[in-house]
Design a protein with these regions (language model features):
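Bacterial Sec-dependent N-terminal signal peptides
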Residues: 1-29
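Membrane-proximal, proline-rich intrinsically disordered regions
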Residues: 21-66, 260
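Conserved, well-structured interaction surfaces
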Residues: 40, 44-56, 81-155, 170-183, ...
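Elongated scaffold/linker segments in the mid-to-C-terminal portions of large proteins
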Residues: 47, 85-91, 95-105, 243-250, ...
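Aromatic-lined, polymer-binding surfaces characteristic
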Residues: 148, 157, 161, 204-213
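Short coil/turn linking the two alpha-helices of tandem helical-hairpin repeats
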Residues: 152-153, 159, 200, 223-232
Length: 310
């Protein structure tokens, strides 16, 4: 009996002790996504993810490469499988459900949603210094312009959205005009060029820089001028492309290799001066290709010119 009484008393004391403890303990796992993204570190983490498609799929597997350059006389199907990727190499059976085009479309818009979140949430940050925040936003806008330039160059007048992704899908998207798309792309790239440094943020070679923004800006001007005859304040996009390209060359010393063989030289593979930026993977200090599978080694075996024999 005494043993039972002692056990009950001990249990009662333990319960009373627990009820007396403070319930205001800090539990970081209870923070909401909005709370995390209201901090500089949280937003920086999301901003880093804006790069993920570059090393994850766009430049490490065949899909984007086949969409970007398929249909030209530079590419052929592999000898042992003439039907492989024929939809994008020969436009044989190309349809809306072709995997390569679907993957590119979905990944570009996914990254655009992340870029939009960074741009829009930067004003809500509760910490961080202004220069670092501006740099992250400039990078996000540069990447957003890059992804939109891929979309408009591949699919024409797509839907322009500057809002982050939500749980509710838009079932009736509306196409924007080519002029609206190029105006936004150019506005983003001008902002990036004015706010990024010559050296990458955190000395991370995978991050975009002023050179990236200016190079993309010149290319976008050339695309808009050549494909659609666009103008800006009465000036041809072609003229704008020339001005930006000359600015890059004269002010920043950007140039091409004298010998095209140097473009493909192994010694220049990870530090190529013609590159606008590097799809380096999540660890930019690792010089190995993070997401290269065995299939990646075959990509250029489908290329007729054989650049490694130049």
């Amino acid at each position: 009996m005494k043993s039972t009484i002692y056990k009950i008393a001990a249990l009662t004391f333990a319960v009373a002790s627990m009820s007396a403890c403070s319930l205001d303990e800090y539990n970081p796992s209870q923070k909401t996504g909005d709370e995390i993204l209201a901090t500089f570190d949280g937003l920086k983490g999301l901003q880093s993810y804006c790069y993920s498609s570059l090393y994850g799929q766009l430049f490490s597997v065949y899909d984007f490469l086949s969409v970007a350059e398929g249909g030209t006389d530079c590419w052929i199907t592999p000898a042992g499988n003439p039907d492989y990727a024929k939809q994008v190499i020969y436009y044989d059976g190309l349809a809306t459900n072709t995997n390569a085009t679907n993957k590119l479309f979905g990944q570009a818009y996914s990254m655009i949603g992340n870029c939009n979140a960074v741009v829009n949430r930067a004003e809500l940050l509760t910490d961080g210094n202004e220069k670092d925040i501006t740099t992250l936003v400039a990078e996000a806008r540069c990447l957003r312009a890059f992804y939109y330039s891929i979309l408009v160059n591949t699919y024409g007048n797509v839907t322009l959205t500057l809002e982050e992704s939500s749980q509710d899908p838009i079932l009736t998207p509306q196409r924007n005009s080519i002029e609206e798309l190029y105006t936004q792309i150019i506005d983003d790239l001008k902002f990036a060029a004015n706010n990024l440094e010559d050296t990458p943020y955190d000395n991370n070679r995978a991050r975009v820089t002023k050179k990236t923004a200016l190079g993309l800006l010149a290319r976008v001007y050339a695309q808009g001028g050549g494909e659609y005859g666009l103008t800006e304040e009465g000036v041809s996009y072609w003229q704008r492309a020339k001005e930006v390209a000359e600015d890059m060359i004269l002010a920043y010393g950007d140039c091409l290799y004298d010998d095209v063989e140097d473009v493909w030289a192994p010694a220049n593979n990870r530090n190529n001066k013609e590159a606008l930026f590097i799809a380096a993977g999540p660890d930019a200090t690792n010089l190995e290709n993070w997401n290269a599978g065995t299939q990646c080694n075959n990509n250029f075996t489908y290329m007729y010119p054989k650049p490694n024999t130049l």
